[in-house]
Curated annotation (Swiss-Prot):
Its EC number is 6.3.5.3. This is Phosphoribosylformylglycinamidine synthase subunit PurL. InterPro entries: PRibForGlyAmidine_synth_PurL, PurL_linker, PurM-like_C_dom, PurM-like_C_sf, PurM-like_N, PurM-like_N_sf. GO terms for cellular component: cytoplasm. Gene3D superfamilies: PurM-like C-terminal domain (3.90.650.10), PurM-like, N-terminal domain (3.30.1330.10). Keywords: ATP-binding, Cytoplasm, Ligase, Magnesium, Metal-binding, Nucleotide-binding, Purine biosynthesis. Pathway: Purine metabolism; IMP biosynthesis via de novo pathway; 5-amino-1-(5-phospho-D-ribosyl)imidazole from N(2)-formyl-N(1)-(5-phospho-D-ribosyl)glycinamide: step 1/2. It comes from the Archaea. Mg(2+) 1 binds at residue 78. It holds the Pfam family AIRS_C. It catalyses: N(2)-formyl-N(1)-(5-phospho-beta-D-ribosyl)glycinamide + L-glutamine + ATP + H2O = 2-formamido-N(1)-(5-O-phospho-beta-D-ribosyl)acetamidine + L-glutamate + ADP + phosphate + H(+).
């Protein structure tokens, strides 16, 4: 994507001349939407990011959150939507590789991956091809570098048939004294380590800053190629190199162009780079191509001349190719050389930030919720439970190695969030979960984004975690489309409101624009990943019950079926408003779960598919039936279908000898039975239920 006429004029005016080919390439990459956030950063600054436990927030490759004395967690989310649409395998694999390298930049050990995936209907051949290969790419890369994929979420929606939303989150831990010190001074060296530069991924950031067309093959060259073997070498290298370096940076989107510009800006120093010194896999490359190549599995290390030998020794030990490509200066300019000749000389003040570009906004009104007839309840329950969105996702996560690293306490499907043991601090654990609901954010972007936040918050709370911090990913269409830009702005406001109300700072995130196919934008998708601390992993809650347990519902069900799975699956409607949020109730819910820690057999959040889906999932996961009087659940609705399928917030199910909330029945036997008083409204064998709720892909 070319620079805009206004941007070109700004560059010419500042330089007093035409930019050189290499300078133009730098601006084209670094000022792309993908790298510069020029259309979004003025809004993202509104998000709360500070708290006493936040050591480092947004602005660098990875944040740091203190989880225990002298121990930090880091987590980061990344989107790889455009590459995954064109080359699903490599698009997904390189997304995983890139997010792992972000975590490495703070010296952390990557301990887990989560994926939030949004595909077209599994019955559609093209959507299925994308889904199968995205899953394969994630699995192959994660398994080969030894980082477990421990959880996530998968959505199916017609809008994602040709334009998937593929999000990867990596979690890492690092001791306080293991974080590179940061800082740089004139004379410090810039080293590029990893694969040799080649033409794979050329223009990747510009590619991610435009919409997709039917001629996707022409963009294949903009998709990077993954190399998990080198990715594993970089993980091992960073583990030992922390004492040899001052600063580490991923060499990702925008290539060396963005890396050099960001390093110069962070340290407010000039840079001199000799582009011909970089090691190349393709010796036919010119300086502009070297500068903007997005070859994967590469990192930048900043070190002092006195520590160079220390770093070189480790690079050779792990057989990682490297080049000394530049140094910092006091001049405040970015100088680029090729075979001794200056091919670019730019003031840092011009390079650092693309001019902000706000766009017009245009609100829209979603379809109001019409009166819908009450359907045959048994058929409606079967329809909701068999929905690909509600179904168990074994067909996906069984392809992942979720046990490698032996930290996984709650595996995919066992609870509402993944739980990881932090052996470095006894029984301490981390709980982490990502959530999104594209229907909610279509109907009301602000309330939908807040719902994504509260759902992830509640999932972490229900397994026994204390939510600490969040990262987000906002995925919408072209910012030049007023309705899409309005969706983005409203989503930011929803995230801000939720973060402030819950006291959970947003420490990082990712915005992906231009998610369109043939001029049609996807449903706006806002994913939120919440990370929390579990004080004792032996007391976490699985989403199960045992024979003889009482079953309890905490929280009130309201007439809230707007945007629900029930409304879509049974009535074919996407209409109304997402569920309302009472943040005081959500915080009370989190406190109640922690109060009951170690005394429950299990617990589960009530969300997608309502009480019917949550109760059925606990039965199927346990392999044990239950007899539930659904009409005993606290509610303000007079309709049985709304009671069963409302997706009201502020609710969870508990199982145990005793439990919080209202007792609605007991677990036991081979049948899952729902009744209203003496009237049975649904009855199925548990083994039939498990089959009904299994995803086929």
């Amino acid at each position: 994507m070319a620079l805009s006429p206004g941007e070109l004029e700004l560059i010419r005016s500042a330089l007093g001349r035409e930019p050189t080919e290499v300078e133009y390439a730098l601006f084209r990459s670094h000022w792309s939407e993908h790298c510069s956030y020029k259309s979004t950063r003025m809004w993202l600054r509104r998000l709360p990011s500070k708290a006493p436990w936040v050591v480092r927030g947004p602005g660098t490759d990875a944040p740091l959150v203190e989880i225990a004395e002298g121990l930090y967690a880091t987590f980061k989310i990344e989107s790889h939507n455009h590459p995954s649409a064109v080359d699903p395998y490599n698009g997904a694999a390189t997304g995983v590789g890139g997010i792992i390298r972000d975590i490495l930049t703070v010296g952390a050990r990557p301990i887990a991956l989560l994926v939030n995936l949004h595909f077209g209907p599994p019955s559609h051949p093209h959507a299925r091809w994308i889904a199968v290969n995205v899953i394969r790419g994630i699995s192959d890369y994660g398994n080969r570098v030894g980082v477990p994929v421990v959880g996530g979420e998968t959505w199916f929606h017609e809008d994602f048939t040709y334009t998937p939303i593929v999000l990867a989150t990596c979690v890492g831990i690092v001791e306080k004294d293991g974080v590179p010190p940061g800082g740089a001074e004139p004379g410090d060296l810039i080293i590029v380590a990893g694969l040799g530069a080649d033409k794979s991924g050329l223009g990747g950031s510009a590619f991610a800053s435009k919409t997709l067309s039917e001629e996707a093959e022409e963009d294949l060259g903009a998709v990077q190629v993954a190399d998990p073997l080198m990715g594993k070498k970089l993980i091992d290298l960073v583990r030992e190199a922390r004492s040899c370096v001052k600063f580490i940076k991923d060499l990702g989107g925008g290539g060396l162009a963005t890396a050099l510009a960001e390093l110069a800006e962070w340290f407010q120093l000039g840079v001199v780079a000799e582009l011909d010194k970089i090691h190349m896999a393709d010796r036919e490359m010119g300086p502009a191509e070297v500068l903007t190549s997005e070859t994967q599995e590469r990192m930048v290390f900043v070190t002092s001349p006195s520590k160079l030998e220390c770093l070189e020794r480790l690079l050779e030990k792990f057989e990682v190719p490297y080049s000394i490509v530049g140094r910092f200066t006091a001049e405040g300019r970015v100088v680029l050389k090729w075979r001794g000749e200056v091919v670019g000389d730019l003031p840092l003040s011009l390079v650092a930030k693309a001019p902000e570009t706000p766009w017009p906004q245009e609100p829209y009104a979603p379809p109001p919720l019409p009166h819908v007839p009450e359907p045959p309840i048994e058929k409606a329950i079967d329809a909701v439970l068999s929905s690909p969105n509600v179904a168990f996702k074994q067909a996906i996560y069984e392809r992942f190695d979720f046990d490698v690293g032996v930290r996984t306490v709650l595996k995919p499907g066992e609870g509402d969030a993944a739980v990881l043991k932090i052996y470095e601090r006894g029984n301490l654990g981390l709980a982490v979960k990502g959530d999104a609901n594209p229907r909610f954010t279509y109907l009301n972007p602000r309330l939908g984004a807040a719902n994504a936040f509260i759902k992830a918050y509640r999932n972490v709370a229900v397994v026994g975690g204390r939510p600490l911090a969040a990262v987000d990913s906002i995925n919408v269409g072209s910012p030049s489309r007023p309705s899409a830009y309005w969706q983005f702005v409203e989503a930011v406001e929803g995230l801000r409101e939720a973060a402030e109300a819950l006291g959970v700072p947003i420490v990082g995130g990712k915005v992906s624009l231009y998610n369109e196919y043939k001029g049609k934008p996807v449903a706006p998708t806002v994913a939120v990943v919440v990370l929390g601390v579990v004080e004792d992993v032996s007391k976490v809650n699985k989403a199960v019950w045992k024979e003889g347990d009482g079953v309890y519902v905490w929280g009130v069900t309201k007439d809230e079926v707007g945007g629900s799975e029930y409304l879509h699956r049974v009535h074919g409607l996407v209409a109304g408003q997402p569920p309302s949020i009472d943040y005081s109730v959500e915080k009370e819910l989190a406190a109640v779960v922690r109060k009951w820690a170690g005394r429950l057999t299990g617990a589960k959040d009530v969300g997608l598919g309502g009480l019917a889906a949550a109760l059925a999932k606990m039965a199927a996961a346990s392999g044990i039936g239950a007899d539930i009087d659904i009409c005993k659940a606290p509610s303000t609705t007079a309709r049985l279908d709304y009671l069963l399928f409302s997706e009201s917030n502020g609710r969870f199910i508990a199982a145990g000898e005793e439990g919080p909330g209202t007792r609605v029945g007991a677990a036991g036997g081979d049948y899952f039975t729902l009744r209203c008083g003496s009237t049975i409204v649904y009855k199925r064998k548990v083994e039939e239920l498990a089959e009904l709720m299994s995803l086929k892909i």
